């Protein structure tokens, strides 16, 4: 077998070939070693070997500094190894853990792969028989055990056990050679020594040199310890004197007295009090100059500064809560009502286990500020824990005190910052966490958010239980897809959609302009921004679901005005639509209506993104060919299948549409979805793709004031899709007047803002025929004749 093409287009490895990975150190049989894959070719080699379950051959480079070694710069003898694990390190570099199996000699190289592939033969171990080999085996074992005893630091118990339990002379020689501090060429020399007696002699000779160094090092260390004896004796006498003073009640440090009083007054549970007293006694026995003294003192300070008790909470006033929510946020009526329900349950059952709210929506729609409003309504402190980019479980649970610079996790740190155990804690960007080599932080959050477990949350640093049951947890996320299922199951998801243009104008008038006036040292009497200017700012200078970019643009306008007042201008300034371009420059958002072209083969679709809805143009054209379907625009697998389905549906309806069937065999059809640099996926473009193909093949244009969404089936049914509200709002913002939607999504109509429904005509589709009737411009004359003329 010379290699075949796999399903994904990659060439498979021949059965008698192996993948070769150059390494900078020698890997011996029977030994497990991690390897960093620092070249793209090495990554591709390891991935294909894993995928096809091929072993790797690890071969030493002759020049370890060579950036991309070829066959000529590699040794012929290497080690056949199995890949045990493939992980990505904290630095982003892939790592593999490999276990050597046996020696392997390369005979010839196989070309045609993006990495090194070779053929060769396995080198079996020779028979270990005879008294000479047995004597060398026992001598090498005694040398290795002596070397392990002479090491400055205690060796791992597994290594000692491996030396003592080596089953064969060959295995022992390879194990010792692997851990010897030798240069790579010396290790390669041992690897290439097949004769067992010669190999044992070489390893024993190298180990004997190392033993001499270790013996000399041990003697020097012994003399150093003797010279330090007097100093240690003085330190011991000082410690004894301090102990005598403590027994007599003399010289007690004021700091210890303060800590003892703080422990008694902190309101800690009895278990925690006992632990604190134990650490306090340990602190009293420790000299202040010792490094351990600072660690124990810091630990005790953390214990006494945490809010162990729960103050009596003020009753929740629902009318006040409504006022605060309306004062801080415009719109979001359903969200506010759900928050009021949440607060009502908290008022009636303060000790109850209320659900954990998770606000999901695009950036800038007010997720974090909603949490702050909840804290104001409950009269509790608000703390925010940012989880974006967290990939270490210790960020949640804390580090054990054995580590230098250890601290509690973010949860306990936030509790200390709040100063109250019943605070409102926002877990921000909970969807941005990721698992790393140090554990999965989302798994640690399962305990934090579970009411059955968080009554005794145990931080690794504190090592005592802390009750989190009175904390009001609120989470935020931009999308749900990246939140693990068990974690998502512990939260009640509340979706926040993007704002309409009218809502953005209201928010700007009520909140953003006032906030930016204060930030720039101006007053409403000095500057006025006309409503028409705000509308132009929203439509032509920002494109977002939230209002962050809008606030930045308002800030730019006001900073321009602030310069004028700082230079002595005194007259009030009024900013209208005509003033925007001189200050902000030309509009940065193109008019989507102007981008449309009323030519056959172009349809306007609608898409959902994590930052709101977008309109999507589907372009189709045909060229002479042999019936291929060409798809471009970074389309995902699902979207590609939608295009195939759309083409098959059009082929099946060719006669009814007046399309010559032979046209499909004589032409290539190309579907493109701008922008080409943006990845796209999902089934909701099925109707738009079908309409673009029908428009192309019948020479009838799709109405330029119409956008559409929906999944299509081979039977011509229009299936429901998600994100209806966001898509319809995006269509209205882009100037569309008619929107074609799946009839099975009619229940989502109530989520569409009233002002948007008043400006759009919503047409509900059961089948593709409904879309053809509503979406294509009527043409005079016989469509079949038009198509024949176009084909000719």
Curated annotation (Swiss-Prot):
<feature type="active site">
    <location>
        <position position="684"/>
    </location>
</feature>
<dbReference type="Pfam" id="PF05362">
    <property type="entry name" value="Lon_C"/>
</dbReference>
<keyword id="KW-0720">Serine protease</keyword>
<comment type="function">
    <text>ATP-dependent serine protease that mediates the selective degradation of mutant and abnormal proteins as well as certain short-lived regulatory proteins. Required for cellular homeostasis and for survival from DNA damage and developmental changes induced by stress. Degrades polypeptides processively to yield small peptide fragments that are 5 to 10 amino acids long. Binds to DNA in a double-stranded, site-specific manner.</text>
</comment>
<keyword id="KW-0067">ATP-binding</keyword>
<dbReference type="Pfam" id="PF02190">
    <property type="entry name" value="LON_substr_bdg"/>
</dbReference>
<dbReference type="InterPro" id="IPR008268">
    <property type="entry name" value="Peptidase_S16_AS"/>
</dbReference>
<feature type="domain" description="Lon N-terminal">
    <location>
        <begin position="16"/>
        <end position="211"/>
    </location>
</feature>
<dbReference type="InterPro" id="IPR015947">
    <property type="entry name" value="PUA-like_sf"/>
</dbReference>
<dbReference type="InterPro" id="IPR027065">
    <property type="entry name" value="Lon_Prtase"/>
</dbReference>
<feature type="active site">
    <location>
        <position position="727"/>
    </location>
</feature>
<dbReference type="InterPro" id="IPR014721">
    <property type="entry name" value="Ribsml_uS5_D2-typ_fold_subgr"/>
</dbReference>
<dbReference type="InterPro" id="IPR020568">
    <property type="entry name" value="Ribosomal_Su5_D2-typ_SF"/>
</dbReference>
<dbReference type="GO" id="GO:0043565">
    <property type="term" value="F:sequence-specific DNA binding"/>
</dbReference>
<protein>
    <recommendedName>
        <fullName>Lon protease</fullName>
        <ecNumber>3.4.21.53</ecNumber>
    </recommendedName>
</protein>
<feature type="binding site">
    <location>
        <begin position="361"/>
        <end position="368"/>
    </location>
    <ligand>
        <name>ATP</name>
    </ligand>
</feature>
<dbReference type="Pfam" id="PF00004">
    <property type="entry name" value="AAA"/>
</dbReference>
<dbReference type="InterPro" id="IPR003111">
    <property type="entry name" value="Lon_prtase_N"/>
</dbReference>
<dbReference type="Pfam" id="PF22667">
    <property type="entry name" value="Lon_lid"/>
</dbReference>
<dbReference type="GO" id="GO:0004252">
    <property type="term" value="F:serine-type endopeptidase activity"/>
</dbReference>
<keyword id="KW-0645">Protease</keyword>
<dbReference type="GO" id="GO:0034605">
    <property type="term" value="P:cellular response to heat"/>
</dbReference>
<dbReference type="GO" id="GO:0016887">
    <property type="term" value="F:ATP hydrolysis activity"/>
</dbReference>
<feature type="domain" description="Lon proteolytic">
    <location>
        <begin position="597"/>
        <end position="778"/>
    </location>
</feature>
<dbReference type="InterPro" id="IPR003593">
    <property type="entry name" value="AAA+_ATPase"/>
</dbReference>
<dbReference type="GO" id="GO:0005524">
    <property type="term" value="F:ATP binding"/>
</dbReference>
<comment type="similarity">
    <text>Belongs to the peptidase S16 family.</text>
</comment>
<dbReference type="InterPro" id="IPR046336">
    <property type="entry name" value="Lon_prtase_N_sf"/>
</dbReference>
<keyword id="KW-0346">Stress response</keyword>
<dbReference type="GO" id="GO:0006515">
    <property type="term" value="P:protein quality control for misfolded or incompletely synthesized proteins"/>
</dbReference>
<comment type="subunit">
    <text>Homohexamer. Organized in a ring with a central cavity.</text>
</comment>
<dbReference type="GO" id="GO:0004176">
    <property type="term" value="F:ATP-dependent peptidase activity"/>
</dbReference>
<keyword id="KW-0547">Nucleotide-binding</keyword>
<dbReference type="GO" id="GO:0005737">
    <property type="term" value="C:cytoplasm"/>
</dbReference>
<dbReference type="InterPro" id="IPR027543">
    <property type="entry name" value="Lon_bac"/>
</dbReference>
<keyword id="KW-0614">Plasmid</keyword>
<keyword id="KW-0963">Cytoplasm</keyword>
<dbReference type="InterPro" id="IPR008269">
    <property type="entry name" value="Lon_proteolytic"/>
</dbReference>
<dbReference type="InterPro" id="IPR054594">
    <property type="entry name" value="Lon_lid"/>
</dbReference>
<dbReference type="InterPro" id="IPR004815">
    <property type="entry name" value="Lon_bac/euk-typ"/>
</dbReference>
<keyword id="KW-0378">Hydrolase</keyword>
<dbReference type="InterPro" id="IPR003959">
    <property type="entry name" value="ATPase_AAA_core"/>
</dbReference>
């Amino acid at each position: 077998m010379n290699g075949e093409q796999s399903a994904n287009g990659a060439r498979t490895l021949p059965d008698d070939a192996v993948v070769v990975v150059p390494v900078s150190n020698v890997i011996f049989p029977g030994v497990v070693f991690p390897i960093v894959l620092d070249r793209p070719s090495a990554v591709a080699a390891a991935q294909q070997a894993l995928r096809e379950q091929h072993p790797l051959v690890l071969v030493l480079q002759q020049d370890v500094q060579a950036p991309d070694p070829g066959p000529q710069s590699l040794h012929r003898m290497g080690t056949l190894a199995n890949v045990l694990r493939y992980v990505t390190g904290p630095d982003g570099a892939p790592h593999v853990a490999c276990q050597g199996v046996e020696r392997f000699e390369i005979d010839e190289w196989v070309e045609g792969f993006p990495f090194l592939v070779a053929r060769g033969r396995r080198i079996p171990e020779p028979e270990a028989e005879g008294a000479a080999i047995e004597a060398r085996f026992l001598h090498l074992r005694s040398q290795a055990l002596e070397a392990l005893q002479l090491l400055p630091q205690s060796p791992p118990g597994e290594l000692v056990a491996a030396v003592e339990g080596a089953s064969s002379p060959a295995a022992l020689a390879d194990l010792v050679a692997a851990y010897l501090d030798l240069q790579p060429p010396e290790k390669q020399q041992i690897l290439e020594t097949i004769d067992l007696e010669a190999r044992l002699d070489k390893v024993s000779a190298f180990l004997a040199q190392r033993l001499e160094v270790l013996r000399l090092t041990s003697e020097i260390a012994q003399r150093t310890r003797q010279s330090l004896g007097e100093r240690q004796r003085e330190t011991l006498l000082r410690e004894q004197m301090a102990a005598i003073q403590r027994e007599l009640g003399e010289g007690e440090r004021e700091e210890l007295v303060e800590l003892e009083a703080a422990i008694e007054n902190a309101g800690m549970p009895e278990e925690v009090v006992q632990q604190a007293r134990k650490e306090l006694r340990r602190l009293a026995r420790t000299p202040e100059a010792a490094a351990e003294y600072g660690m124990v003192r810091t630990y005790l300070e953390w214990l006494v500064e945490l809010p162990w008790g729960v103050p009596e909470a003020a009753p929740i006033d629902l009318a006040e809560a409504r006022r605060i929510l309306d004062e801080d946020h415009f719109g979001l009526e359903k969200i506010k009502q759900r928050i009021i329900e949440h607060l009502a349950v908290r008022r009636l059952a303060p000790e109850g286990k209320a659900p954990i709210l998770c606000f999901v929506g695009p950036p800038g729609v007010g997720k974090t500020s909603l949490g702050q409003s909840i804290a104001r309504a409950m009269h509790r402190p608000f703390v925010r824990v940012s989880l974006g980019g967290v990939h270490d479980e210790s960020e949640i649970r804390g580090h054990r005190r054995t580590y230098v610079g250890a601290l509690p996790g973010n949860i306990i740190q936030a509790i200390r910052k709040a100063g109250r155990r019943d605070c409102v804690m926002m877990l921000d960007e909970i969807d941005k966490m990721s698992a790393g080599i140090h554990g999965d932080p989302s798994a640690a959050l399962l305990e934090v958010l579970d009411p059955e477990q968080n009554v005794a949350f145990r931080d690794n640093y504190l090592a005592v239980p802390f009750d989190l049951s009175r904390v009001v947890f609120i989470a935020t996320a931009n999308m749900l897809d990246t939140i693990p299922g068990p974690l998502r199951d512990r939260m009640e998801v509340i979706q926040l959609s993007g704002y309409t243009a009218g809502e953005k104008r209201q928010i700007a008038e009520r909140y953003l302009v006032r906030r930016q006036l204060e930030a720039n040292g101006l007053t409403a009497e000095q500057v006025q921004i006309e409503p028409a200017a705000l509308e132009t700012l929203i439509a032509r200078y920002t494109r977002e679901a939230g209002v962050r970019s809008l606030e930045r643009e308002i800030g730019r306008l006001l900073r321009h005005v602030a310069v004028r007042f700082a230079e002595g201008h005194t007259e009030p300034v009024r900013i209208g639509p005509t003033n925007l371009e001189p200050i902000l420059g030309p509009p940065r958002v193109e008019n989507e209506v102007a981008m449309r072209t009323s030519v056959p083969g172009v349809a306007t679709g609608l898409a959902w993104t994590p930052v709101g809805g977008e309109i999507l143009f589907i372009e189709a054209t045909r060229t002479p060919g042999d019936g291929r379907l060409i798809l471009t625009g970074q389309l995902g697998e699902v979207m590609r299948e939608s295009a195939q389905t759309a083409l098959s549906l059009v082929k099946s309806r060719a006669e009814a549409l007046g399309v010559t069937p032979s046209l499909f065999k004589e032409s290539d059809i190309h579907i493109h979805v701008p922008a080409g640099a943006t990845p796209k996926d999902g089934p909701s473009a099925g109707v738009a793709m079908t309409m673009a193909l029908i428009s192309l093949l019948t020479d009838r244009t799709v109405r330029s004031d119409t956008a559409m969404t929906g999944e299509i089936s081979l039977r011509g049914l229009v299936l429901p899709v998600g994100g209806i509200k966001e898509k319809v709002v995006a269509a209205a913002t882009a100037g569309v007047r008619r929107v074609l939607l799946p009839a099975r999504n009619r229940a989502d109509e109530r989520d569409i803002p009233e002002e948007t429904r008043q400006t759009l005509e919503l047409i509900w589709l059961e089948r593709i025929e409904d879309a053809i009737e509503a979406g294509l411009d009527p043409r005079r004359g016989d469509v079949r004749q038009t198509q024949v003329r176009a084909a000719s």
